[in-house]
A protein has these predicted regions:
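Beta-propeller blade termini and top-face loops
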Residues: 3-208
Length: 208
């Protein structure tokens, strides 16, 4: 992500898949990528899985941290360090909002987030959790949340996909990507399948 007017660039680094390492978290550059500073680091076992910037205010950032470890015979996705963090000052300071009202309790796995360009304060999240996995929404920059869909088709292989994307022009349209492409036009209440050339949908971008 980047604020092109100030040459600020942000990178969400998930880190090494097979063991602990320090190259995880959120990194920030203020000179177009020449130099970098780590601005959010949870631990050597947990990295940043997703990152979203508010197009209306690029100082607002939200990220998800995923505790995970992969080996040749298994994948452990989730743990007590997984969570959601938000910054209102361009990444200088971060607040852990994982336990804010409305979010699911219990251990979290991989999560995706997307700030709506069409409605101030609205953020979408798709959350892998041992309790109440689903799509969540906030209208006040993460202070309180509500579960808007517990459709398990939206959680296909969440440790592998887990991407959500807010439509840039319609506040009630949101996309969820996994082995299928899902689209909602009613604020997340219902989703329909959108045909794609291949059943492996990791990301989406819409020209604003």
């Amino acid at each position: 992500l980047g604020d092109v007017y100030k040459r600020q660039v942000y990178v969400a680094a998930l880190g090494h898949a097979f063991g602990p390492n320090s190259e995880r978290g959120i990194f920030k550059s203020i000179d177009g990528g020449v130099n970098w500073k780590k601005v959010l680091f949870v631990s050597e076992n947990s990295g940043a899985a997703d990152l979203s910037m508010d197009p209306g205010n690029p100082r607002v950032l939200i990220t998800t941290i995923c505790q995970a470890k992969r080996s040749f015979w298994r994948l452990d996705s989730g743990g007590p360090e997984s969570g959601i963090y938000i910054s209102f000052d361009g990444g200088d300071n971060w607040e852990n909002i994982t336990k804010n009202p409305g979010l699911p309790e219990g251990l979290k796995g991989r999560m995706g987030v997307s700030i709506s360009p069409a409605k101030e304060g609205r953020i979408w999240a798709t959350i892998e959790s041992e309790i109440d996995t689903g799509v969540y929404r906030t209208e006040n920059y993460g202070k309180t949340w509500a579960l808007v869909s517990d459709d398990q088709d939206l959680q296909g292989r969440p440790w592998y996909y887990q991407h959500i994307f807010a439509d840039p022009s319609d506040e009630n349209t949101v996309w969820v990507m996994n082995y299928s492409c899902h689209k909602s036009t009613d604020g997340g209440k219902t989703f329909e399948l959108v045909p794609t050339p291949h059943g492996d949908n990791h990301d989406i971008w819409i020209d604003p």
